[in-house]
Amino acid sequence: MGRVEKFRFYRQSFDNNKIVKKALINAQKNTESWKKQLNKINQKILINYHPFSEFNKNPVKHHTEPNKLFKTLQELIVDLKNTDFKLLEEKVDRMWLNAAYNQTSSGYESWISDDKGIEKINHLSKFYEANEKQWLKKTSNLTSDLKEYNKILTVFSTESFAFKKSIDNIEPNLFNANKAIFKNLVITLISFMLFSILFFLIFLIVSFVSFV
């Protein structure tokens, strides 16, 4: 297959995909519009339509309801004629005409012969390759940064655990040391109080003796 045939095949595939996507989008929009219109029509039918069996129950309705039903059906036909079904048919015809036109080589030979298509495709290929390399590089850098971050977190967790453990080990020693200091302080205070009482007693005795 030559270069021209390859690009023609590539172009036709691209155009066909584009046409199909457009047709699907238009069909989706039209379907939503038709659903709204049909809902309005259904409301008219539900409001105005009555089965013929009900006409026999009420003789007064016997002569009026058929005419009303006929009028409702006429309105229904008018509503159906005013929908976008005809527009859809025209759009489909235009779509296939465009597809048939795109399959011809008119308007594209200069694009192929001047190598504009090859340049464009090569440019896009290089662009995507460069972006892919850049993305891979960023991903690699991000991965290494995450590894370093996890390493720091691990070290911090280990150090934090060791610090907490050392604090736990120090706390009993501090308690014991404070306990000993408190004990010595209490003994000193008791000794001072006893010495003061003894001194006061001696003072009283001496005072009493000298008074006598």
UniProtKB/Swiss-Prot annotation:
Domain of life: Bacteria
UniProtKB keywords: Membrane, Transmembrane, Transmembrane helix
Compartment(s) where it occurs, according to its Swiss-Prot or TrEMBL record: Membrane
Annotated GO CC locations: membrane
Record field: transmembrane: 186-206
Membrane topology label: Single-pass membrane protein
Record's protein name: Uncharacterized protein MG331
Originating species: Mycoplasma genitalium (strain ATCC 33530 / DSM 19775 / NCTC 10195 / G37)
